[in-house]
Amino acid sequence: MRKIELQLREAIRNFRPFSKQNTTFSRMAGTEEGWQLCLHGNPIACFDQGGKHPTIPTYVSLAGWNTVTTRSRLNALDGVEIRTKNFTPYLNGREIEDNGWWSPCNLNY
């Protein structure tokens, strides 16, 4: 895991705003408990601080960018495993699309 991802995990666990290089973690506008993770300004994960498992993202997205960096940032999150096989992305073992939002909790067996 990259150093930036270790720092990101710490920020998420403490719900502390984080910004370094191309990655930001911040409170979502207009919400009390909603947080988002962005890569290059594109949201790739949403969190509910008041949820049952607040450090596991409510939804994740490749934001149309199935890249090594996007997958690496998402794989640094609790409850998320993104893999690619033959250019097809998989979230926690289930096939997903490059675009759209996916719930890691609803995909677990």
Identify the function of each model-found stretch:
Residues M1-Y109:
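Terminal leader/tail segments of proteins
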